[in-house]
Amino acid sequence: MASARDLHAHRQRLLADEQGTLHKVARVRIALCYPSPYHVGMSSLGYQTIYREIHLHPGASAERVFLPDDVEAYRRTRTPLFTFESEAAVSGFPMLAFSVF
């Protein structure tokens, strides 16, 4: 049975294998959501392009959000959906963007 700590550790393992992760502080923060698990979302060239384009804008930054691999664990532990870059709760973002292609 996964705990909230396990959910965050899973995110950290995924990030450890990444290359080219973008980190930026900007006035406009956007949670860029993909309605599928991490591996599907990161295979989407459209999603990656939108992520990069947002970061090219001087006043905006994007943090990635994916459908959890284990949705039931999030519900059971009452873990809010959070971003990959900062583990910030999606509910705290002023803007949500969705990539569905």
Residue ranges and their predicted role:
Residues 1-101:
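A short, structured N-terminal alpha-helical element that caps or precedes a catalytic domain
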